[in-house]
Amino acid sequence: MSWVIVTGANGGIGAATVHELIKNNYSVYAADLADKPHESFAAYGDAIFRYRSVNVSDEESVRALARAAAEVGEPIQGAVLAAGIVHSKPLLDTSFEDWKRLHAVNADGVFLCLREFARAMIEQIQTSPENTRSLVTVASNAARVPRAEFGAYGASKASAVRVSSSFGLQLSRHGIRVNTVCPGTTRTPMVTDAWNGEDLSALSVAGSPETFRLGIPLGRIADPADIAAVNAFLISDASRHITMQNIVADGGATF
């Protein structure tokens, strides 16, 4: 059974991705900052699920994860990089510490994970002409358009998009594909926490002309499962001729 690494596995999109991959007969090496895995993973045995506490912004922590995943026995099929943090504040009010913290996780973490996972995969198999190995970065539609309150966040995600496509170009000769997924507003704990107890989904759907933000033409915010399905597709052989692409899954919010 093929193994896929999932970072940010305890988060909304990360957890949904773990479940979607296991449903599609992948084994998952899950990682998150927390000491213990999400309670919804309790039924999964060691044959299909492993967990490790990892700080994606720490080079040695990421390297140790790559080593551990490589030692499971089966080759690493790919990875979904779903670890991320959000920050909502105008740029004029954003501290340099906040800026660095966002980039440490959302940009540096993506670079470290892509580099270390790719190194481990190449060490296992130098090249795979079938192009079945895949790395997927979960970014954000804020990487594509300016957001009044998400300037620093969008910049960190834009960095993740660009470094992912650059890795995709360099790893193509090894038969490893690299793509990014850009969700829009998704009902995850990270998003609902940022709403401070209010349900702002209707506002997201309607848009905000005063902040030059379009609404969502499909009429709803995303569920984590919506994004997980895209992640699983990009991991699967069905996408073996897709690389260096940025797949936007935001209900049309950035058309």
Model-flagged regions — what are they?
Residues 10-11:
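Conserved glycine-rich cofactor-binding loop
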Residues 218-249, 254:
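C-terminal substrate-recognition "lid" of short-chain dehydrogenase/reductases
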Residues 172, 177, 242-244:
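Short, small/polar-rich loop/turn modules that mediate ligand/substrate recognition or access, typified
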Residues 90-91, 98-100, 212:
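Substrate-binding pocket helix/loop in short-chain dehydrogenase/reductase
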Residues 114, 156, 164:
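Active-site helix of classical SDR
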Residues 140:
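Residue(s) in the substrate-gating loop at a strand-loop-helix junction
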Residues 119, 169-170, 240:
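Alpha-helical segment proximal to the catalytic Tyr-Lys
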